[in-house]
UniProtKB/Swiss-Prot annotation:
The gene is ADCY5. The modification Omega-N-methylarginine is found at residue 23. Its EC number is 4.6.1.1. The protein contains two modules with six transmembrane helices each; both are required for catalytic activity. Isolated N-terminal or C-terminal guanylate cyclase domains have no catalytic activity, but when they are brought together, enzyme activity is restored. The active site is at the interface of the two domains. Both contribute substrate-binding residues, but the catalytic metal ions are bound exclusively via the N-terminal guanylate cyclase domain. Interacts with GNAS, GNB1 and GNG2. Part of a complex containing AKAP5, ADCY6, PDE4C and PKD2. Interacts with RAF1. It holds the Pfam family AC_N. Residues 1-195, 395-769, 1005-1261 are cytoplasmic. InterPro entries: A/G_cyclase (IPR001054), A/G_cyclase_CS (IPR018297), AC_N (IPR032628), Adcy (IPR030672), Adcy_conserved_dom (IPR009398), Nucleotide_cyclase (IPR029787). Its main location: membrane. It comes from Homo sapiens. This is Adenylate cyclase type 5. One of its GO terms (cellular component) is membrane. Phosphorylated by RAF1.
Amino acid sequence: MSGSKSVSPPGYAAQKTAAPAPRGGPEHRSAWGEADSRANGYPHAPGGSARGSTKKPGGAVTPQQQQRLASRWRSDDDDDPPLSGDDPLAGGFGFSFRSKSAWQERGGDDCGRGSRRQRRGAASGGSTRAPPAGGGGGSAAAAASAGGTEVRPRSVEVGLEERRGKGRAADELEAGAVEGGEGSGDGGSSADSGSGAGPGAVLSLGACCLALLQIFRSKKFPSDKLERLYQRYFFRLNQSSLTMLMAVLVLVCLVMLAFHAARPPLQLPYLAVLAAAVGVILIMAVLCNRAAFHQDHMGLACYALIAVVLAVQVVGLLLPQPRSASEGIWWTVFFIYTIYTLLPVRMRAAVLSGVLLSALHLAIALRTNAQDQFLLKQLVSNVLIFSCTNIVGVCTHYPAEVSQRQAFQETRECIQARLHSQRENQQQERLLLSVLPRHVAMEMKADINAKQEDMMFHKIYIQKHDNVSILFADIEGFTSLASQCTAQELVMTLNELFARFDKLAAENHCLRIKILGDCYYCVSGLPEARADHAHCCVEMGMDMIEAISLVREVTGVNVNMRVGIHSGRVHCGVLGLRKWQFDVWSNDVTLANHMEAGGKAGRIHITKATLNYLNGDYEVEPGCGGERNAYLKEHSIETFLILRCTQKRKEEKAMIAKMNRQRTNSIGHNPPHWGAERPFYNHLGGNQVSKEMKRMGFEDPKDKNAQESANPEDEVDEFLGRAIDARSIDRLRSEHVRKFLLTFREPDLEKKYSKQVDDRFGAYVACASLVFLFICFVQITIVPHSIFMLSFYLTCSLLLTLVVFVSVIYSCVKLFPSPLQTLSRKIVRSKMNSTLVGVFTITLVFLAAFVNMFTCNSRDLLGCLAQEHNISASQVNACHVAESAVNYSLGDEQGFCGSPWPNCNFPEYFTYSVLLSLLACSVFLQISCIGKLVLMLAIELIYVLIVEVPGVTLFDNADLLVTANAIDFFNNGTSQCPEHATKVALKVVTPIIISVFVLALYLHAQQVESTARLDFLWKLQATEEKEEMEELQAYNRRLLHNILPKDVAAHFLARERRNDELYYQSCECVAVMFASIANFSEFYVELEANNEGVECLRLLNEIIADFDEIISEDRFRQLEKIKTIGSTYMAASGLNDSTYDKVGKTHIKALADFAMKLMDQMKYINEHSFNNFQMKIGLNIGPVVAGVIGARKPQYDIWGNTVNVASRMDSTGVPDRIQVTTDMYQVLAANTYQLECRGVVKVKGKGEMMTYFLNGGPPLS
């Protein structure tokens, strides 16, 4: 076994651990004192707070948090970044927490250590390296080759890979369900790639068809539960959208009623249907906003609303007079578009509704206007208008739904990552707090976050406690037990036994400090003071003796416990910078250790001080410890042996035992176990072992942690469901978003939102260009042709083609030259540039909608008819058109009244084209709602001015001709003229129609932007919480890696471990070093002048910190610090695949170089601290067993004969010399190291051994 049980100075019977001393000099900018912008071993934006992010009122995000969002903590599933020679993290914690040496003045640094620090400072001040882009995707071999990055053992890696694989599979399954169209054309592109085409080659026709079909596929998530969560996520927003749609539908119905009321006689069926539609919609609006309305009712409400719209459509087209194929186009377009945009239905339902509304209008127009000679032109134009409206609806609905599903998916992924980090963080916290008491761990983490003032010495984490009891226990006869077991069986035996001791310590209110070989020691009264600390230690000792007696019965080996207890004062805490372990120091600790050494097997040996705290509750007899231990005799310590409890104490213990049994029975009892591998199994039958182990109180291996068995996906969904139910959209909107402008109240938040890139901008431009084409076709169909029309449309087409081409390059950037790529990126990635391009595109579309009006005949038909009939213009009506000698009709394109300009008899199609241009405006989702409103109002103002001033005669003429056409149809050749054949003037209808559209489109734009901003905000808050959790996790991980090796920490964080679960590895060739300060015990004294010994410990902390800085250098990355024991420093190399060099033996040479470096450093320390410390170092190589004893309170260590001999090389060594064994000599001599033979040395347990002194490294060539 390891010789680490030795105690070097008075009060140093225990192992030391490392403490951080965060320092913040000018060259140490980060919270950990690093010179570069790294935090917790991962890239961190400089200038950001190292603390967890602090939220401003209203949940706004600070600039530091935004920086942290830009450089996120890597998840624990990712492999560690490769460590290189200039990386301060190489080989472990290579940090200097002070700005200058404790051994020199605050001036220059002219020693070897100073130059080393300068080199490391220069390295750390270099450019910050980001983690590998692949995250955890790299191979272990690649990671191992990258500068000595450690690789987990295969046994650990398999479990982690399985867990990662499950997580990735779930993520991919969900990510694939976000949208069907985002990856459209994959099948075709992959097929083409096989034909030798380059990246982004021409897509096949099949791929294009698949891309189009993808749009109409269901976007449902594969999981019904996830789909319901998505519906719940957007339920309030959909409810608001549905209410808004009902309001605008009521407005449209009222406008239709007003138009009908303005042209008598009134038709009761028409009025009844529209009034009923308004009533039904209002009732539905009330029901939809009741508390009882939930997402299951949403579908019914949507389809009911579609039915109402269809009824209004049919009645609105069949009943009004005068008839016209252009009648009702504006509300049909309105109905179609609002179903796509404001009605929360699936794409296929929206498409079917739009097509059905279009078909109804076309069918009714064909039936009621079958005798019109010009009907074909109108029907073709109507088909183009409805087709364009449906396409624009699809182009609006599809990206909106995809964006919503992506926002939901990304938010869920943030929550999933946060919960994953939270689970791992809880495991880390549990593991961390099992090794370090809470107050020490919290102080360390606080110092990590806080910027420390520059100090000469590292901060030391030590507290003084005056009234405690210290228990040391050693297994007597352990050598005999060890001789009957292999090294692995011995480790398992110790693991099971000490796991039981840990459980007993918890029951008896004792804190286990450390395990040193077969020695176990604990303290009662830490960290919280207890008046009965002496009683707790005595009861702990009794339980330990009882537990070892069961081992004796099971194994048949004569083993026993020797227990020593002393009460007094201790200093507790950690020392150094690496491999922290909580420890205690003081002369009283030294005395307690000697009480164990001078005790008797199976008895509890106590001092007079402890007896005074027991208050006569135990019967004792004189211990005569001085007869068995020289230290006790030298210091005249009066000792006693516990005989038994008094009757009063027995009654108290019986009451406590009864309460424990009742608690156990209420929970249920499970069969105990020894673990999967039982070193004592062959000695007795299974039943007998079970019986004995039952008496020892081991747990059932079948017990599983409830959290482990829970499905993480269900946990994420449940958490998300609670968050959805808890969030208030109105509160979020009022707290963070301005009501009218819809901008964030926090400027930083608005800036971050504005920097979002919409990858679909090219699609928006393409859709607007498609609207332009439809408008062109409508105008060509319905308006007389002219050279101006042709030239204007060709010019606009070329401009739009260029804009589309440049915008689309962003999506397939690799196919085009670099200047075009740069131009496309500048347009798409800049909100201002993309908005300007969008406005330019919309302007061209708008111009195409009405510019042909200026080529039409503007003569007033009323004036011509008044002149012909010799009446005033106010007396002219439609009957005069029918009675005119001139054939004025809608089919006549020759100019009226002798005008050379052609007649445009259907000017309402200009209005419908303008409506399409307004729809094109709504396609650009990246333009703000206020921007769209300003743009649409400008379009409306310009067009209405044109209609009301220069184009008013055009619309008045059309009104006369439509009414006259209806009179001809109804008279059917008779001479009667119905005076009631009237029509609301187009110049009145047009501004109202456009205003209704502008209002509806603005409400839709506001809804879209509001949804996008709330999604952004919720995702940002979820990301922020995830970042805070990951930041805390990174701190904990950093602390853990200073306690356990990374591969070991990963093993224990993989899942909850049982108290007696074992982790170990067999290592075939490990170099082991023990380095002790031989005369430190002479230096350590407890005086009031040195704060009862604290200042001595402060100096020891500096020495250990210097050793830790040296082992952190890249050239020593193969080394692993094991622990410190008092003033003894223990390290080893070759403990895993990445550090073991079977051929070159570089790990052995690295340890020899490290030993020589420690000698040089000690000389430097002596020179600058005016001391004369003498070091003895022992080295050995051979096989060891590395593992962790106590899964719940893990302590990493190595065991085996190799370790014992290395310890003996130290203890039998000579001050200021490095003693090595023959095996070590052979390796070093073969590599031309300078050694000399010391001769034969007597070694305890080994007899005589030939040893050598290491004098220096290979001669320089």
